[in-house]
Regions:
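Alpha-helical segment proximal to the catalytic Tyr-Lys
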Residues: 172-173, 214-218, 277
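Short C-terminal tail/terminal secondary-structure segment
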Residues: 29, 37-38, 268-269, 280-293
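Residue(s) in the substrate-gating loop at a strand-loop-helix junction
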Residues: 185
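Conserved mid-core segment of classical short-chain dehydrogenase/reductases
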Residues: 14, 110, 115, 123, ...
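Catalytic Tyr-X3-Lys loop
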Residues: 129, 145-164, 181, 205, ...
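A glycine/serine/threonine-rich, flexible loop-to-helix segment
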Residues: 218, 230-253
Length: 293
C-alpha cells in the first residue's frame, strides 16, 4: 500500500507554545509549516498560466503560490512589507522551479492598493489567468465584549473588502477560461465564540463566492472557494488562538492533528486548472474531517 496513514503523515505531537506579533513570520516558527517547498511535486498542470496570490508569503498562500509555480505557472504574490523575509523565500522556490516570481508588498486594507496590485501583477506577469485570495486577519477575544468596533473593522477590511476590490479590478483582465479562488474557513460554517468577527468574515466570503459565480459564469470565469480547517500557520501563533491552545492545536479534528499547508496544494491547483472546467460556485472543505454544510 503506497498511501500514508493521514493521521500520522505529519506532526501529531504537541506544538511548542510560541508567540509573535501580528502578522507573524513563518521563518520564525517552530516547526516551520510545510508549504511544499520540497514535498510538493508538480506535473505541469498549469503550464503557461499567470497567477496572483494574496498572502503568498506564508502558510496557505505560500503553499498555493509554490504549487502553482511547480505546475508551470508564473506567480505574483502580495504580502505586508514586514513579511519580506518570508516572501523572499517563496520567490526563491518559484524561481528554482523555473518560473517568474513577482513580489508586490503592500497593505490590502488600502482600497487603491488593491487596484494597483492587480495592475502591477498583470503588467509584470504579462497576463492574468487566476486570482487566488488568501490574505487574512484573525485575532481571538475571550468574550463578546472584547470585540470592539475597531477590531471588527480591521477584520473585515482585511478579509472581505480587499477580496471585492481585487476581483473588481481583475475583471478588466480575466478572460473566458480564467478563474478566481477565494479562501474561507470551517469557521464560516462552525463559528467559534472567540472568533466572532473572523467567522463572520469567512461566512461573507462564502456568500461572495457564490454570488460572484452567478454573475461571472455566463462570462466564462469560474469562482470557487477553499474552506480550510485548522492549519499550522503564523496566523495561529500571532493572536489567532490563545497560547493555551497552541500545543494541542488541531488535535480535536477526526484525523487528530493540524493540517500542513502543503495538504491544500492539490485543491488550489485543481480549482485553477482545466480539470475543474465544469466547477464553479463551490466550496471545498479541507479540514481534517471537520464538517462543512
Amino acid at each position: 500500500m503506497a498511501a500514508q496513514d493521514p493521521r500520522t503523515k505529519f506532526k501529531t505531537t504537541d506544538y511548542e507554545k510560541q508567540e509573535q506579533e501580528v502578522p507573524g513570520l513563518q521563518s520564525e516558527m517552530t516547526p516551520a509549516p510545510d508549504c511544499g517547498e520540497t514535498s510538493y511535486q508538480g506535473n505541469q498542470r498549469l503550464q503557461g498560466y499567470k497567477m496572483l496570490v494574496t498572502g503568498g508569503d506564508s502558510a496557505i498562500g505560500r503553499a498555493a503560490a509554490i504549487a502553482y509555480a511547480k505546475e508551470g505557472a508564473d506567480v505574483a504574490i502580495n504580502y505586508l512589507p514586514s513579511e519580506e523575509q518570508d516572501a523572499q523565500e517563496v520567490s526563491q522556490v518559484i524561481e528554482e522551479s523555473g518560473q517568474k516570481a513577482v513580489l508586490i508588498p503592500g497593505d490590502i486594507r488600502d482600497e487603491q492598493f488593491n487596484y494597483d496590485l492587480v495592475e502591477q501583477a498583470y503588467q509584470q506577469l504579462g497576463g492574468l489567468d487566476n486570482v487566488t485570495l488568501v490574505a487574512g486577519h484573525q485575532q481571538y477575544h475571550d468574550d463578546i465584549h472584547g470585540f470592539t468596533t475597531e477590531a471588527f473593522t480591521e477584520t473585515f477590511e482585511t478579509n472581505v473588502y480587499p477580496l471585492f476590490w481585487t476581483v473588481q479590478k481583475a475583471l478588466e483582465y480575466l478572460k473566458p477560461g480564467a478563474s478566481i479562488t477565494t479562501t474561507s474557513s470551517v469557521q464560516g460554517y462552525n463559528p467559534s465564540p472567540i472568533l466572532h468577527d473572523y467567522a463572520a468574515s469567512k461566512a461573507a466570503i462564502i456568500s461572495l463566492t457564490k454570488s460572484f459565480s452567478e454573475e461571472l459564469g455566463p462570462k466564462g470565469i469560474r469562482v470557487n472557494c477553499v474552506a480550510p480547517g485548522p492549519f499550522w500557520s503564523p496566523l495561529q501563533i500571532s493572536g489567532g488562538q490563545p497560547q493555551s491552545k497552541i500545543p494541542t492545536f488541531g488535535q480535536k479534528t477526526p484525523l487528530g492533528r493540524a493540517g500542513q499547508p502543503v495538504e491544500l496544494c492539490g485543491t488550489y491547483v485543481l480549482l485553477a486548472s482545466e480539470e475543474s472546467s465544469y466547477t464553479t460556485g463551490q466550496v471545498f472543505g479541507v479540514s481534517g474531517g471537520v464538517q462543512i454544510d
